[in-house]
From Swiss-Prot:
Keywords: Acyltransferase, Amino-acid biosynthesis, Cytoplasm, Methionine biosynthesis, Transferase. It comes from Hahella chejuensis (strain KCTC 2396). This is Homoserine O-succinyltransferase. Transfers a succinyl group from succinyl-CoA to L-homoserine, forming succinyl-L-homoserine. The record marks R325 as: Important for acyl-CoA specificity. Its EC number is 2.3.1.46. The lineage of its organism: Bacteria, Pseudomonadati, Pseudomonadota, Gammaproteobacteria, Oceanospirillales. The gene is metXS. Homodimer.
Length: 385
């Protein structure tokens, strides 16, 4: 917990809830008659409502992107390094909105929420949601907040997919989009990793076909394993080697098959156990499926440049050299399609040892690129503060 709030922090923030009692038809064909979105805001909306920035979260993210909920918090929001006074997403200049996506488990309507039609948790009956569904629900939130357009829509990983979808779906409402450590569609390898994670969850004897709540159980072992698999893909070989190497927890080998002996094993167990206590298993299944399904080029016979034709915004695309989940060549594929579609795009491949997680870590080169882009965004705002 902080003894004092740092001067470059947004400070103490209070989550808010937007309730929608109008139907939302989803891409799967099903409909939610009502739903709520949990969100936070940082900074002040200017008089002509032109300085709003939307933050889109990744797979396990949520609305709490910056600041603290109380002085007892052990750490700030998940992207606090980039949001706040003087930071790339400068809250002295921008009004920032961050939300928990539909289907999430941090306050927005999702599988753990009560289905008003049954009085029980949705569980596996919660409909499949896609990136397109998220963007449409985010547009409803923008309407509720009376935000006609975004100065920028920004996201890393799965969040970058949402930023890209925003630029295609609502071209008149997005002036700039930052697509960081992301991809225009998953590779077969990435889909395979997601399937292994889902299988780990659904194979847990406490899963009960997603109705674990009705059995007062929880598939924590399966979710722990899913997170361990996922976490490996977020790190680079170099960062794991530097942090753990082949270090042992004890001085000597135990020659046991079931003992946790290496430091890297211990770390993965810790990450998996912590995650399994704070995330909903059905939400994890939903989020990985949304990742799998995202492919804006599919409706255009695989031609990504045609999918991008409606977009009118300026893009920033950032990749990281050691990201093997969404490697630089996937960002380059996106950039090439943007160029072919005659879009305005800036691209940076940042040298970082941190793998896919590099988009969360404020290395100097990354921050320089991010600051430069957001500085240009700020200059476009009329009467920018």
């Amino acid at each position: 917990m902080p003894e004092v709030i740092p001067p470059d922090s947004v400070g103490i923030v209070t989550p808010q809830v937007a309730q929608f009692d109008i139907p939302l038809t989803l891409e799967c064909g099903k409909q939610l008659n009502s739903f709520q979105l949990m969100y936070e805001t940082y900074g002040e909306l200017n008089a002509d409502r032109s300085n709003a920035v939307l933050i889109c979260h990744a797979l396990s993210g949520h609305h709490h992107a910056a600041g603290y909920h109380s002085m007892e918090d052990s750490k700030p929001g998940w992207w606090d390094s980039c949001i706040g006074p003087g930071k790339p997403i400068d809250t002295n200049k921008f009004f920032v909105v961050s939300l928990n996506n539909l289907g999430g488990c941090a306050g927005s309507t999702g599988p753990a929420s009560i289905n008003p039609e049954t009085g029980k948790a949705y569980g596996p009956d919660f409909p499949v949601v896609t990136v397109q569904d998220w963007v449409r629900s985010q547009a409803m939130l923008a309407d509720r907040l009376n935000i006609p357009h975004w100065a920028a829509v920004i996201g890393g990983s799965l969040g970058g997919m949402q930023a890209l979808q925003w630029s295609i779906e609502y071209p008149e409402r997005v002036h700039n989009a930052a697509v960081i450590a992301s991809t225009p569609r998953l590779s077969a390898q990435n889909i395979a990793f997601n399937e292994v994670a889902r299988k780990a969850i659904t194979s847990d004897p406490n899963f009960y076909e997603g109705r674990y709540g009705e059995h007062t159980t929880y598939p924590d072992k399966g979710l722990m394993l899913a997170r361990m698999v996922g976490h490996i893909t977020y790190l680079s070989n170099a960062s794991m080697g530097e942090k753990f190497g082949r270090d042992l927890r004890a001085q000597t080998l135990k020659f046991g098959l079931l003992d946790v002996q290496f430091e890297v094993e211990s770390y993965l167990h810790y990450q998996g156990e912590r995650f399994s206590k704070n995330f909903d298993a059905n939400t994890y299944l939903l989020m990985t499926r949304a990742l799998d399904y995202f492919d804006p080029a599919r409706a255009h016979e695989g031609d990504l440049s045609k999918a991008l034709e409606p977009a009118k915004c300026k893009y920033l695309v950032v990749s990281f050299t050691t990201d093997w989940r969404f490697p630089p060549d996937r960002s380059e594929e996106l950039v090439n399609a943007m160029v072919e579609a005659k879009k305005s795009v800036s691209y940076a491949e940042v040298d970082s040892p941190h793998g896919h997680d590099a988009f969360l870590i404020p290395t100097q080169r990354y921050m320089d690129v991010f600051h430069g882009f957001m500085g240009r965004v700020a200059k476009e705002i009329p009467h920018a503060r």
